[in-house]
Amino acid sequence: GDAERGKKLFESRAGQCHSSQKGVNSTGPALYGVYGRTSGTVPGYAYSNANKNAAIVWEDESLNKFLENPKKYVPGTKMAFAGIKAKKDRLDIIAYMKTLKD
């Protein structure tokens, strides 16, 4: 994926609810360090039981499926987002998310 394009997509599609900064939770949990992290584990964020209990490790395949249709991939998630239909857009966002780390 194209991380630069993914950053713009992240800001327009996810930025209203998610921060890309470390430790900054908003409507949704901070997505800094999300790649390789287990679902439902950001300190200080009140997750749905569905996300806490899913124990998904966020990697290419899981992020791709979740971003395509969050409520299908994690039934009961409180993420009120229809999903991103274009695979290239999802892959570019994932490429950007991989850069959000120490």
From Swiss-Prot:
Record: residues binding heme c: 17-18, 79
Residues recorded with modification N6,N6,N6-trimethyllysine: 85
InterPro entries, A to Z: Cyt_c-like_dom, Cyt_c-like_dom_sf, Cyt_c_1A/1B
Location in or out of the cell: Mitochondrion intermembrane space
Keyword annotations from UniProtKB, A to Z: Acetylation, Electron transport, Heme, Iron, Metal-binding, Methylation, Mitochondrion, Respiratory chain, Transport
Residues spanning the membrane: none
Compositionally biased spans, kind Polar residues: 17-26
PROSITE patterns linked to this entry: CYTC
Amino acid composition bias (Basic and acidic residues), ranges on this chain: 1-11
Gene Ontology molecular function, alphabetical: electron transfer activity; heme binding; metal ion binding
GO-annotated cellular components: mitochondrial intermembrane space
Modified residues (N-acetylglycine): 1
Modification note: Binds 1 heme c group covalently per subunit.
Domain of life (superkingdom): Eukaryota
A Pfam family of this chain: Cytochrom_C
Region (Disordered): 1-26
Annotated PANTHER family: CYTOCHROME C
Family: Belongs to the cytochrome c family.
Role, per record: Electron carrier protein. The oxidized form of the cytochrome c heme group can accept an electron from the heme group of the cytochrome c1 subunit of cytochrome reductase. Cytochrome c then transfers this electron to the cytochrome oxidase complex, the final protein carrier in the mitochondrial electron-transport chain.
Protein name (Swiss-Prot/TrEMBL): Cytochrome c
Lineage start: Eukaryota, Discoba, Euglenozoa, Euglenida, Spirocuta
